[in-house]
Amino acid sequence: GTCAGKYVLQAYVNPPKGRMAKPATALVGFAKTRLLEPGESETLTIAFAPYAFAAYDDEGVIQKSAYVLEKGEYRFCLGENVRETADVAYRYALESDVILAQLSEKCAPKQLHRRMLADGSYRVLSCAPETPREDWRKLEGIPDEGQYPLEIPDQIPGCAWIPPIKPQLIEVANGELTLEEWMSLLSDEDMVRLLGGQPNRGVANTFGFGNLPTYGVPNVMTADGPAGLRIKPECGVTTTAFPCATLLACTWNTGIVREIGAAGAREVHENGVGVWLTPAINIHRTPLCGRNFEYYSEDPLVAGEMAAAMVEGIQSEGVGASLKHFACNNKETNRKDSDSRVSERALREIYLKGFEICVKKAQPLTVMSSYNLLNGLWASQNRELLTDILRGEWGFEGMVTTDWYTHAPQYTEIAAGNDVKMGCGDPAHTLKMMREGKLSREDVKTSVKRLLEMILKLA
């Protein structure tokens, strides 16, 4: 043509038809040119590993609880979109089945007994043992008796500042003390208070982390959201409204998304906020989901790559990103008590894949667990999700928070690897559970350490 423009190149794989059902065509990579003048060209490179198109075997067809490549011919195509690909660019014949990663069963469903196949027939699924109704109360950690009100730290009338009387966190930052040495001075009460959200200050309206003044732990503020920094409207401070996540994904341009992340993070930093509650990365499963505008795509690869770019941009400015909502938060109606029932294969290949890509590529400082139940257990108290998969399999190094005001008891969340309860914790009940032996001090200490490590990484 006669106009300058950019071109998107997409790579697809056509896997062989084997014993495991697979998509006929799957996106495995993409790239976008710079702005090209008429007649100008650019060479693009798209790289991907076999893991990108491996299938997860949750039935034991080839190897149970493993990512596998079935034997047969894999055809790779390039094009502008899935409907307009050129002839097969490359063929590879795999002579035998390959086990790429041997894992173990996690987050298996209890009430999904059949899987529909391409021909309309069904295959029986293995399910985790269903929890008897009489055990639900124990599983969900519902307190046996009494009410446990939130304890607010005592305020000193007329005193705006408390002189430091304890070793300060800045001494850890300066290398005068190790974090372990400093933490050894904290009481159980100190640690439990740190694991709940803290009051707003400044322009923030989504609460903060930390806030232990006698030890010099700052109250690090958070702020929404995926379309730009959102602060108290009465403050009179204007911020930029960036294009929504879905529109950003339509660009296929991770470079632009990275720049937007950095620009937004500068606004976050200027307004005294430490953690920006973005990106949101749940799958576009249905057009009826009330948060689709905050989510990138129906394709987990696109969602994961866009989120990774956003996190890289945000954290390049010394601001923490919060990857959310982990996981399967695909509806807003009754979102705090709805149960997302999904097979382990669909969970790993679709609903967790974007999170996996983002965590492995960009290491967000925080991950936010979701409100909903996942196969019968609240995500915020699901140890297989938050510890075994997120940290054990993917190598996540940061802190996990709940979404705001989840229904699960805080002590069960801490034990699962959910470090901080937002927008506030339940210190009295959590401390009671520690003293009764239902929550270990080691689990509490681990969560506090993750919180403090996150604070020390902020600019």
Enumerate the language-model features and the residues they cover.
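Short beta-strand elements
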Residues: 84-107
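Glycoside hydrolase catalytic-domain context in secreted enzymes
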Residues: 1-84, 105-459
